[in-house]
Structures are given as C-alpha cells and as structure tokens.
Amino acid sequence: MEKLADLNYTLSVITLMNDTLHTIMEDPGMAYFPYIASVLTVLFTLHKASIPTMKIALKTSRCSYKVIKYCIVSVFNTLLKLAGYKEQITTKDEIEKQMDRVVKEMRRQLEMIDKLTTREIEQVELLKRIHDMLIAKPVDKIDMSQEFNQKHFKTLNEWAEGENPYEPREVTASL
C-alpha cells in the first residue's frame, strides 16, 4: 500500500514506461508516439489512483456497493472525457435527484400560475364592477327636449338661457 501511494515510485514507473516506449519505437518520425504515451500515462495514473481509493473507501465506508459504483462510474466518465465524448454515465441516484429537481420546479411554476390566475380573476371582477358603475343611463330618463336641433327652429329669445350654445364664443387669454 505504501508503494502504491509513493510519488517517487509512480514517477519512476512512468519514466520506465517512457524509456521502454523509446527503445521499442526507435523511429524518430513516429507521429503517434506522444498520443500513445499520454494514453498509457493516463491509464497508469487511473490504475494507481483507483485501486488505493477503492480499498480505502471499502474499509472506511459501510455502503461499499454505492462507493464501488461511484468509483467505477467516475473512472468511466474520465475515460469518456479523454476520448472526447460529451455524454456521461449517470447512476440512478443522480437521475432521481434530477427528477426531484424537475418536479420541484414544476410545482413552483404551477403555484405561480395559480397565483397569476387568481389575480387575473380578481382583475376581471374589478373591471366588471367599474363597468357597471360607468354604464350610461337609459335614454328615456334623460330630458332631451332642449337638445333636438334647436338652432334651426328657435331664435335667440326662445333659448332656455338666452343664448345659442352652438355659436362660437370669443375667448381671450391673459398673458
């Protein structure tokens, strides 16, 4: 266990791998060498990191299945990211968390819609009351005897107040 976590040991293994690859592929024009070396380095690092982590997690944790599942999913997600995929593997727990979040958001939006609907109903009732107050009274209750084309039939002396309401008046404004 001490050898697995030792940084010098890990670095010496990586150097040994690089030296071995250099001796195997002596062709200096090898174009894929950096890619192969980086993939092998990542795989070695994952191997070195995952085994001690899983051993420690199994010893300290009571729920070993969930920890192993999480470690495996993390390793596969790392490999998928290195391969260039944007998709990730998710566990049922993560899916349930996302579904709970979506359901919570839907409930919040339904409550907001309910509040807005209640406000709109109150506004419609208020507009109906305002309309009922503003409704014009029926024509048969208003005395229209003074309004029927009096300028054609009556003279100035016959008007009720003594002057024709349809004639323009002179208005002077003070400056």
Curated annotation (Swiss-Prot):
Location of the protein in the cell: Host rough endoplasmic reticulum membrane; Host membrane, Host caveola; Secreted
Membrane-protein topology: Single-pass type III membrane protein
SUPFAM superfamilies documented for this protein: Rotavirus nonstructural proteins (SSF58030)
GO CC annotations on file: extracellular region; host caveola; host cell rough endoplasmic reticulum membrane; membrane
Listed transmembrane segments: 29-51
Binding residues annotated for Ca(2+), in chain numbering: 120, 123
Example of a GO biological process term: monoatomic ion transmembrane transport
Entry keyword set: Activation of host autophagy by virus, Calcium, Enterotoxin, Glycoprotein, Host endoplasmic reticulum, Host membrane, Host-virus interaction, Ion channel, Ion transport, Membrane, Metal-binding, Secreted, Signal-anchor, Toxin, Transmembrane, Transmembrane helix, Transport, Viral ion channel, Virulence
Cytoplasmic side: 52-175
Glycosylation sites: 8, 18
InterPro entries to which the protein is assigned, alphabetical: Rotavirus_NSP4
Post-translational modification: The N-glycosyl content is primarily Man(9)GlcNAc, with a small amount of Man(8)GlcNAc.
Pfam families for this protein: Rota_NSP4 (PF01452)
Assigned protein family: Belongs to the rotavirus NSP4 family.
Subunit structure, as described in the record: Homotetramer. Interacts with the immature particle in the viroplasm. Interacts with host CAV1, early and late in infection. Interacts with host integrin ITGA1/ITGB1 heterodimer. Interacts with host integrin ITGA2/ITGB1 heterodimer. Interaction with microtubules blocks trafficking to the Golgi apparatus.
Function summary: Plays an essential role in the virus replication cycle by acting as a viroporin. Creates a pore in the host endoplasmic reticulum and as a consequence releases Ca(2+) in the cytoplasm of infected cell. In turn, high levels of cytoplasmic calcium trigger membrane trafficking and transport of viral ER-associated proteins to viroplasms, sites of viral genome replication and immature particle assembly. The secreted form acts as an enterotoxin that causes phospholipase C-dependent elevation of the intracellular calcium concentration in host intestinal mucosa cells. Increased concentration of intracellular calcium disrupts the cytoskeleton and the tight junctions, raising the paracellular permeability. Potentiates chloride ion secretion through a calcium ion-dependent signaling pathway, inducing age-dependent diarrhea.
The name this protein goes by in its record: Non-structural glycoprotein 4
UniProt source species: Rotavirus A (isolate RVA/Dog/United States/Cu-1/1982/G3P5A[3]) (RV-A)
